[in-house]
């Protein structure tokens, strides 16, 4: 099967959930036997260049051409898709559509939603067009609406609401046009089915290929520390983190506990949070999160906005970190409150819950062992690739 795979950018290095998911699926589909041609933007931090190839994968990388959020205001495209709506990407897409016969064209995320119209125009009137697949990373319409409603600044909320309306229009167009939609969680799948019950919707949770610890023992000798790992470049991630730090930091400081935030984000954002924090450390981007997980007792998922599948949850599970989270923030994994995870209603309850169990090392070890047991055999990338290919072939 010859697959034209359209995605935002070269996924290397895979330092956030979007790149982990895209890169994992591309590798898995190629390993399952498809010949995959990937069209994406170059990334300066990646060693890969245009024309690079591997077994069953070849890369057509358009010039790196950053586009500002302000530039998208005048476009009918949302900022997510406007980023890759470059002259080089459009030219490369036209060349690839003309170059050969494709069995399937994959729209990997709403970021390449702009490509729908040129693809439709190219195959207008064709009796045998490729199967079109939309790989969703979130149910974007509901997610962006939630992010806008949680924004406290009136001006920012107005801007986010306008962009959210653009997202909704583009996502609906993609869902209506393609032959198959994949959802990253069962909950997202239900949202797509509610509007289009006639559309083939398949749940395609991520796989995991990172570090797995055979065993780990949390002891009283370890720092009384909880850790939040993530990429904090997106506004929803920053909102979640700021709300949690504001609630947790004074409680942790009083209890003599530590909160460590590990991951990338604008330094000005971290500097602002540092000014009001006593018990919280912000590391910025690190080469590996493993040493930070090894020195913490608890992993935290404090996300009120953001939707979708949290790939860091798998990293926590397979590194044997007991997880405490906001209710509703952990989807797509076989963990349930008091069975491999502890869930709380709001940030204050979450912070207090962390301190309640911080010194109960027997409970913490039971939690990490149970979560590992529940997830051990559930997140294979190879099975994801085989499943996606067989689903496309059956359309």
Show which residues each predicted segment covers.
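Conserved acidic donor-binding segment of nucleotide-sugar-dependent glycosyltransferases
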Residues: 341-348, 356-361
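A charged, aromatic-enriched C-terminal amphipathic alpha-helix characteristic of glycosyltransferases
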Residues: 17, 359-392
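N-terminal subdomain of nucleotide-sugar transferases
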Residues: 1-55, 98-100
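Donor nucleotide-sugar binding/catalytic pocket of nucleotide-sugar-dependent glycosyltransferases
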Residues: 141, 160-213
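Acidic donor-binding loop of glycosyltransferase active sites
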Residues: 179, 294-308, 321-322
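Acceptor-binding helix/loop patch of EC 2.4 sugar-transfer enzymes
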Residues: 67-79, 133-166, 328
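Conserved catalytic-core segment of nucleotide-activated headgroup transferases in glycan assembly
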Residues: 203-278, 282-294
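Short hydrophobic beta-strand element within catalytic cores of glycosyltransferases
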Residues: 312-315, 322-326
């Amino acid at each position: 099967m010859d697959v034209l795979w359209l995605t935002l950018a070269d996924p290397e290095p895979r330092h956030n959930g979007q790149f982990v998911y895209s890169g994992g699926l591309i590798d898995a589909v190629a390993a399952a036997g498809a010949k995959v041609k990937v069209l994406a933007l170059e990334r300066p931090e990646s060693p890969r260049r245009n024309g690079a190839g591997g077994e069953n994968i070849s890369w057509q990388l358009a010039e790196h051409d950053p586009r500002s959020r302000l530039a998208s205001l005048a476009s009918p495209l949302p900022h997510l898709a406007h980023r890759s709506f470059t002259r080089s990407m459009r030219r490369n897409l036209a060349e690839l559509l003309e170059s050969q016969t494709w069995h399937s064209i994959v729209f990997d995320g709403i970021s390449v939603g702009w490509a729908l119209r040129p693809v439709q125009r190219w195959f207008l009137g064709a009796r045998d067009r490729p199967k079109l697949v939309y790989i969703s990373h979130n149910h974007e319409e509901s997610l962006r609406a939630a992010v806008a409603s949680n924004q406290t600044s009136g001006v920012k909320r107005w801007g986010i609401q306008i962009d959210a309306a653009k997202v909704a229009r583009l996502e609906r167009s993609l869902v209506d046009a393609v032959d198959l939609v994949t959802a990253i969680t069962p909950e997202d799948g239900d949202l797509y089915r509610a509007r289009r019950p006639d559309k083939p919707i398949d749940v395609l949770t991520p796989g995991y290929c990172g570090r797995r610890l055979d065993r780990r023992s949390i002891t009283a000798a370890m720092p009384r520390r909880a850790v939040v790992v993530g990429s904090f470049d997106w506004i929803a991630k920053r909102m979640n983190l700021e709300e949690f730090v504001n609630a947790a930091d004074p409680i942790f400081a009083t209890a003599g506990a530590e909160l460590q935030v590990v991951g990338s984000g604008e330094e000005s954002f971290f500097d602002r949070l540092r000014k009001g924090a006593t018990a919280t450390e912000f590391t910025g981007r690190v080469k590996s999160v493993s040493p930070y997980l090894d020195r913490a007792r608890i992993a935290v998922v404090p996300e009120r906005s953001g939707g979708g599948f949290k790939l860091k949850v798998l990293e926590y599970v397979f590194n044997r970190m007991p997880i405490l989270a906001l209710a509703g923030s952990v989807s797509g994994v076989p963990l349930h409150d008091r069975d491999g995870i502890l869930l709380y209603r709001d940030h204050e309850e979450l912070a207090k819950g962390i301190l309640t169990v911080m010194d109960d090392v027997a409970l913490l070890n039971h939690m990490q062992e149970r979560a590992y047991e529940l997830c051990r055999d559930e997140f294979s990338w190879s099975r994801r690739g085989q499943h996606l290919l067989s689903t496309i072939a059956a359309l």
